[in-house]
Amino acid sequence: MNAKIVNTLNQPPIAGPFLVFNRLQWAELRKSVPLTLTEQDLKPLLGINEELSLDEVSTIYLPLVRLINYYIEENLRRQTVLNRFLGGQHPKVPYIISIAGSVAVGKSTSARILQSLLANWPQARKVDLITTDGFLYPLADLQEKNLLQKKGFPVSYDTPKLIQFLADIKSGKPHVKAPIYSHLTYDIIPNRFNLVNQPDILILEGLNVLQTGNKAKTFVSDFVDFSVYVDADEALLREWYIRRFLKFRQSAFNNPHSYFKHYASLSEQDAINTATNIWDTINGLNLKQNILPTRERANLILHKGADHAVQEVKLRK
């Protein structure tokens, strides 16, 4: 008896709760979605260490935006049903997308690209972007609590304040304040805020947005409708962090207002050694202990290769 051969070339394999796509399989899901970004539009969206192409936007981000819009439309239908059931029109509930992942993986770039693409979708939705950096404790507080070496770890965030911010957003409150963080001064900017005024979509980008924990009853992830984890092998993340540190040494660290201005005078080898030590004792440790364990909680995982291009996409079923 001859066995029947089934062509599964274009079918994604199943890995536990995820469907797994290679670049080609994922790119096919773009369908006819138009690319609204140009090379000129793309440049300001990139991080200091990235050279993302329009091909990457077309291949990876357009299918993702198409998927997210399906989810948003379904969410709007549920809100309509609820309003009908309750017999009135209630404040719209913003759709919250979280972007998680390690330091130096390119979360901020992914968040800015998604913001631009979603805002230029035919429905012309209002899309705001907030980073959780603004909810770090002020530098003086971290120093007083001896937490400077734990900056970026869950303990360094004012999590109740972040949760209250998200609760206000989800309740439809107007003009919700988000504190602003300065990477130059390494601190919260006093009396400066971003105002979030009833967006259709809020993108929340940060290291620990998928974090749960043992003591709290409410988590940041409880307010998130769709979560993305930007992933890469640790050896690559370490390399990217060191490369970024060297670029900052030649640029931002030279600013007299920079918290890290003392690094500007380091030799290249001393700078590499310093960055390696920071990675091994802080960022790499945070990745292993707090960030990486949350990866499987995401709705979608983007796994990057050596050139920052996404090689594999995992989508929760």
Swiss-Prot record:
Compartments, as annotated in UniProt: Cytoplasm
Name assigned to this protein: Pantothenate kinase
Gene (UniProt): coaA
Binding site for ATP: 101-108
Known EC number: 2.7.1.33
Any one Gene Ontology BP term: coenzyme A biosynthetic process
One Pfam family hit: PRK
Gene3D superfamilies according to UniProt: P-loop containing nucleotide triphosphate hydrolases
Pathway: Cofactor biosynthesis; coenzyme A biosynthesis; CoA from (R)-pantothenate: step 1/5
Cellular component GO terms, alphabetical: cytoplasm
GO MF annotation terms: ATP binding; pantothenate kinase activity
Keyword line: ATP-binding, Coenzyme A biosynthesis, Cytoplasm, Kinase, Nucleotide-binding, Transferase
Cross-referenced NCBIfam families: panK_bact
Catalytic reaction(s) noted: (R)-pantothenate + ATP = (R)-4'-phosphopantothenate + ADP + H(+)
